[in-house]
């Protein structure tokens, strides 16, 4: 059973001591059938006055830290080791109610799935709906797997992965119009396309493991990653990564699930200080396979090297994902 260790370090810097408000930290991987957390640690400097753990409305693990000390830096380091048993491509049988689309959700499940079925963004001209419907067979019911797999691989082939300097997740129609975006943009685009078909879908945030022994052509490594979960009767929640064309959880480490990307921000908080006190942030993320002696020996060194690299690349996607969530209160 593969063991993976995730190192995630974030450092916020200020040009003078500032006070810190409450911070919500969502970095601990989720326990599940295919993923078991063996160990998890969280180091924060300056030391919090209090640190408590809760589960949010989606069952994600969230640490809430409060502070009574001023400092010029705020550092958060998470290290977790997980036993990862990836679920391969799912298989529906002809007897399953969701084998063909359209299908109907069970009336007992439907009320709980409504929040994941209702589109979140407008589609005034029907462009997003039209894009989604190109994966349907014109002459009858469509195998559901063909729709989901078609979208996953279609986005990867037709769209261009592009790191953006703007904060947040772009509108799905912008992703469609430009044919480009980040992993978060791709995930939200596919989620909305599925919702316009009446299929329940939600956002997943986590990490991507890139094996060193083969060339997968993955993008999105070295930072937090985003993909999609789809709910099907008889199958439950199933993973799809349109950025890398992955069906199932191979090389995907799940941290949080949410209806909206803003509910799955890794680190969210505020500081109280002058408007010009904030200097910038640095992020280093490293996912390694436990048991590879050479990799294990290099993991800490690689993390530090990556952190230094992100100092020079302050506007990259992972920096956006966390800096947007640090709501700076300026006085």
Model-found features: residue ranges?
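Surface-exposed charge patches
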Residues: 192
């Amino acid at each position: 059973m593969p063991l993976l260790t995730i190192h995630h370090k974030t450092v916020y810097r200020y040009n003078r001591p500032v006070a810190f408000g409450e911070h919500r930290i969502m970095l601990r991987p989720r326990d599940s059938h295919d993923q078991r957390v063996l160990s998890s640690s969280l180091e924060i400097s300056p030391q919090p006055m209090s640190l408590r753990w809760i589960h949010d409305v989606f069952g994600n693990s969230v640490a809430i830290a409060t502070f009574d000390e001023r400092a010029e830096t705020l550092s958060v380091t998470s290290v977790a080791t997980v036993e990862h048993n990836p679920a391969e491509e799912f298989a529906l049988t002809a007897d399953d109610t969701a084998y063909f689309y359209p299908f109907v959700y069970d009336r007992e499940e439907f009320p709980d799935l409504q929040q994941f079925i209702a589109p979140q963004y407008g589609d005034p001209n029907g462009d997003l709906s039209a894009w989604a419907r190109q994966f349907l067979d014109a002459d009858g019911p469509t195998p559901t797997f063909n729709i989901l797999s078609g979208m996953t691989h279609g986005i990867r082939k037709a769209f261009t992965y592009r790191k953006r300097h703007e904060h947040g997740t772009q509108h799905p129609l912008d992703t469609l119009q430009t044919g480009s975006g980040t992993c978060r943009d791709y995930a939200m685009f596919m989620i909305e396309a599925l919702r316009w078909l009446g299929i329940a879908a939600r956002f997943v945030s986590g990490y991507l493991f890139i094996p060193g022994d083969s060339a997968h052509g993955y993008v999105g490594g070295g930072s937090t990653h985003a993909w999609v979960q789809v709910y099907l009767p008889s199958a439950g929640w199933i993973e799809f990564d349109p950025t890398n064309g992955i069906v199932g959880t191979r090389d995907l480490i799940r941290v949080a699930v949410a209806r909206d990307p803003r509910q799955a921000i890794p680190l969210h908080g505020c500081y109280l200080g002058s408007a010009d006190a904030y200097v910038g942030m640095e992020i280093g993320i490293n996912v390694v396979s436990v048991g590879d002696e050479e990799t294990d020996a290099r993991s800490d060194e690689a993390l530090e090297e990556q952190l230094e690299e992100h100092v020079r690349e302050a506007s990259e996607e992972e920096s956006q994902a966390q800096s947007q969530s640090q709501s700076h209160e300026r006085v």
